[in-house]
């Protein structure tokens, strides 16, 4: 068979296009045009704008970017989104490009609590342009004019909001997602700022959902939310933006974090009491464990302080933005209730700072108590070690004074006891009796001699714990005396 015509092959390739097919739907597919950069998110400056009907904050403003590398292969990059980008069920590291191939599975965001799959799931395909046309989602060019008037009325510029530091990879999700007990981060504040640009009539359902989620936010958040609801203006006017929801959400999450911090403090206090009861035994294992607990407690304290300080700084920035927004509203609409709400939020902020200071002092007290307990345990260990050394020293004195032969001044070797109850080395007393048949100590006549196995065994056991020089010297003496005895 002949080779295919290059011109025909090029025409076939030109009629085909890469696309992200949305799973479970025959529409809202995202076309990847060759030579272009495709951006996806909920903002206005992206190629494809995704607005979630269930959880508006699931998709970040500029969630991800798809473009071709120098080899012409398509890549996807997570643009530091809050809920992440998943390629074949694995979360991508932010700001790193990953190559995609035909058949790959792409997921934007995370599944909601009541569902198994995420709202936006796609499959990478390559099809004819004509067959793709009915299924493609419209590009953001069609929605630019629609939201143009709305963007001009916003008091917070999108550039200023986008400059807030975005979080890296995290398991944090929106209030309806699984594992939503973690505190909200700056990305959630962006979403609240967008929601604030809508009329108050549209904000009422959101406030109702916040009331429903009060139960899991802790007692501090439950007491804060009704106060904020009372401060909302009774008269609803079109296009009255407010960032109070973002402040409320940040307060709730910060208070929840403070409750966890207090619980951990109570647990550490109980642990200190238990250690005090058991520290009298003074084992080295306890010393090591207490040192490790102390280091863990210090690192936890520093981490909690850093997180709380970051949230306080973000809260102060939000308050500054709300104050600027409030000034604009007073000039246009004259609503003084928002100013009262800001003052109340500042009072809550001061209370939060006081609570943080109290928590810090409590942690410092716990650390000081652990330091004192550790010092006492070390002192007890030193005392036990000193007692052991004293016993060993006393044992050496006994060996030197009571278990030495008076003739050779060495520890008994094959000890024998005479009829006068004095003990000597068997070799030494035999040599002595060649000159005199009387005890070298009491001068009584030697009538009998008895081997003392008890003394031999006792001396052998004690010599095993002495230095190697002493053991070597004793072995040499035993060999020499046995050799002389054979002669």
From Swiss-Prot:
The keyword Flavoprotein does not apply. Residues 38-92 form the FHA domain. Residues 135-195 are annotated as: Disordered. A zinc finger (RING-type) spans 405-443. One of its GO terms (molecular function) is identical protein binding. Pathway: Protein modification; protein ubiquitination. Autoubiquitinated through 'Lys-48' and 'Lys-63' of ubiquitin. 'Lys-63' polyubiquitination is mediated by UBE2N. 'Lys-29'-type polyubiquitination is also observed, but it doesn't require its own functional RING-type zinc finger. Its EC number is 2.3.2.27. One of its GO terms (cellular component) is chromosome, telomeric region. It catalyses: S-ubiquitinyl-[E2 ubiquitin-conjugating enzyme]-L-cysteine + [acceptor protein]-L-lysine = [E2 ubiquitin-conjugating enzyme]-L-cysteine + N(6)-ubiquitinyl-[acceptor protein]-L-lysine. Residues 184-193 have a biased composition (Basic and acidic residues). Its main location: nucleus. Residues 68-72 are annotated as: Required for interaction with PIWIL1. Keywords: Cell cycle, Cell division, Chromatin regulator, Chromosome, Cytoplasm, DNA damage, DNA repair, Metal-binding, Mitosis, Nucleus, Phosphoprotein, Telomere, Transferase, Ubl conjugation, Ubl conjugation pathway, Zinc, Zinc-finger. It is found in: Nucleus; Cytoplasm; Midbody; Chromosome, Telomere. It comes from the Eukaryota. Pfam families: FHA, zf-C3HC4. The keyword Membrane does not apply. InterPro entries: FHA_dom, RNF8, SMAD_FHA_dom_sf, Znf_C3HC4_RING-type, Znf_RING, Znf_RING/FYVE/PHD, Znf_RING_CS. The modification Phosphoserine is found at residue 157. E3 ubiquitin-protein ligase that plays a key role in DNA damage signaling via 2 distinct roles: by mediating the 'Lys-63'-linked ubiquitination of histones H2A and H2AX and promoting the recruitment of DNA repair proteins at double-strand breaks (DSBs) sites, and by catalyzing 'Lys-48'-linked ubiquitination to remove target proteins from DNA damage sites. Belongs to the RNF8 family. The FHA domain specifically recognizes and binds ATM-phosphorylated MDC1 and phosphorylated HERC2. This domain is also required for proper recruitment to DNA damage sites after UV irradiation, ionizing radiation, or treatment with an alkylating agent. PANTHER family: E3 UBIQUITIN-PROTEIN LIGASE RNF8. This is E3 ubiquitin-protein ligase RNF8. It comes from Rattus norvegicus. The lineage of its organism: Eukaryota, Metazoa, Chordata, Craniata, Vertebrata.
């Amino acid at each position: 068979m002949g080779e295919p015509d290059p011109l025909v092959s090029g025409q076939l390739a030109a009629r085909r296009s890469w696309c992200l097919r949305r799973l479970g739907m025959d529409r809202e597919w995202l076309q990847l045009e060759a030579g272009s950069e495709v951006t996806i998110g909920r903002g206005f400056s992206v190629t494809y704008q995704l607005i979630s009907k269930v959880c508006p904050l699931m998709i970040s403003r500029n969630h991800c970017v798809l473009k071709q590398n120098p080899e012409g292969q398509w890549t996807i990059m997570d643009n530091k989104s809050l809920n992440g980008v998943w390629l074949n069920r694995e979360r991508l590291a932010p700001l790193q490009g990953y190559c995609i191939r035909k058949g790959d599975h792409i997921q934007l965001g995370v599944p909601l609590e009541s569902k198994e799959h995420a709202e936006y799931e796609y499959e990478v395909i390559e099809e004819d342009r004509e067959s793709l046309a009915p299924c493609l989602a419209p590009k953001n060019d069609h929605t630019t004019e629609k939201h143009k008037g709305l963007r001009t009325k916003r008091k917070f510029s999108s550039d200023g909001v986008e400059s807030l530091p975005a979080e890296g990879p995290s398991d944090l999700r929106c209030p309806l997602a699984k594992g939503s007990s973690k505190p909200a981060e700056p990305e959630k504040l962006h979403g609240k700022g967008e929601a604030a640009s809508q009329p108050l009539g549209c904000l009422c359902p959101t406030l109702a959902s916040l009331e429903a989620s009060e139960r899991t936010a802790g007692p501090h958040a439950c007491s804060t939310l009704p106060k904020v609801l009372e401060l909302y203006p009774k008269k609803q006017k079109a296009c009255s933006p407010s960032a109070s929801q973002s402040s409320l959400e940040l307060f709730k999450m910060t208070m929840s974090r403070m409750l966890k911090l207090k619980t951990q403090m109570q647990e550490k206090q109980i642990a200190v009491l238990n250690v005090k009861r058991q520290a009298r035994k003074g084992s080295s294992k306890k010393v090591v464990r207490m040192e490790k607990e102390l280091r863990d407690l210090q690192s936890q304290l520093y981490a909690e302080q850093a997180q709380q300080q970051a949230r306080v700084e973000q809260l102060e920035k939000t308050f500054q933005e709300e104050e600027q927004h409030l000034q604009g509203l007073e000039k246009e609409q004259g609503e003084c209730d928002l100013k009262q709400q800001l003052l109340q939020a500042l009072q809550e902020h001061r209370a939060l700072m006081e609570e943080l200071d109290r928590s810090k002092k409590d942690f410092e007290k716990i650390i000081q108590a652990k330091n004192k307990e550790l010092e006492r345990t070390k002192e007890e260990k030193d005392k036990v070690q000193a007692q052991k050394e004293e016993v060993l020293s006393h044992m050496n004195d006994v060996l030197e004074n009571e278990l030495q032969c008076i003739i050779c001044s060495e520890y008994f070797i094959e000890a024998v006891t005479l009829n006068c109850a004095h003990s000597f080395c068997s070799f030494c007393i035999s040599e002595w009796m060649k000159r005199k048949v009387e005890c070298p100590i009491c001068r009584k006549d030697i009538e009998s001699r008895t081997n003392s196995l008890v003394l031999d065994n006792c001396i052998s056991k004690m010599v095993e714990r002495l230095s190697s020089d002493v053991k070597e010297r004793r072995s040499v003496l035993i060999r020499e005396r046995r050799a002389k005895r054979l002669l």
